[in-house]
Swiss-Prot record:
Function per UniProt: Part of the ABC transporter complex CcmAB involved in the biogenesis of c-type cytochromes; once thought to export heme, this seems not to be the case, but its exact role is uncertain. Responsible for energy coupling to the transport system.
Gene Ontology terms for molecular function: ABC-type heme transporter activity; ATP binding; ATP hydrolysis activity
Keywords: ATP-binding, Cell inner membrane, Cell membrane, Cytochrome c-type biogenesis, Membrane, Nucleotide-binding, Translocase, Transport
Family classification: Belongs to the ABC transporter superfamily. CcmA exporter (TC 3.A.1.107) family.
Gene3D superfamilies: P-loop containing nucleotide triphosphate hydrolases
Protein name as it appears in the record: Cytochrome c biogenesis ATP-binding export protein CcmA
PROSITE patterns: ABC_TRANSPORTER_1, ABC_TRANSPORTER_2, CCMA
EC number(s) per entry: 7.6.2.5
List of residues binding ATP: 39-46
Amino acid sequence: MQSVNQLKIDRLACQRGDKILFTDLSFNLQSGDFVQIEGHNGIGKTSLLRILAGLAQPLSGKVRWNSEEISKCREEYYYDLLYLGHHAGIKPELTAWENLKFYQQAGHCRQGDEILWNVLEKVGLLGREDIVASQLSAGQQKRIALARLWISQAPLWILDEPFNAIDKNGVKVLTGLFEQQAEKGGIVILTSHQEVPSSALTVLNLAQYKFTDNE
């Protein structure tokens, strides 16, 4: 990882349909930051993460990665980014092994088959690696998606509800992984409906930036 990376959010506003969700949202993140985006349902947490990941456009404002607008450095930005959304984002026609191999070869990842075997064991898919993803349960498909976390060397992780359908021990394991990512100089941004058991976490509440009619 680069010694210092910075994600700068400058006066973002977000609109969904006819509704403005938030306005004038600004903050800076740098290597070592571990942040939870908090707020009630419908306030715009997922919309914000999609904007930060370059998958949606803000109503106004800029997102910069290492001082450059992400729209102008897409190739570099996507190489440096691991984004996990609500959906597993895997290829249903590929096996668990093939999905991880595809991701490993295409992304900013640790290389080698031994890495994949270790990760499959870690997420409980060893023995199911040759099953086509479409034949696996929704929970098992999510494990394929989460397995990318142990493979990725991307410095920026943006994760939408990574703890959904994960038991208490799994939450603890994932939280430890997120802390390690930050300690290594990465940046982790996530949303969660449950408490994140980490003293290293910084919380940003979107309610502070909620649009009101008298603004």
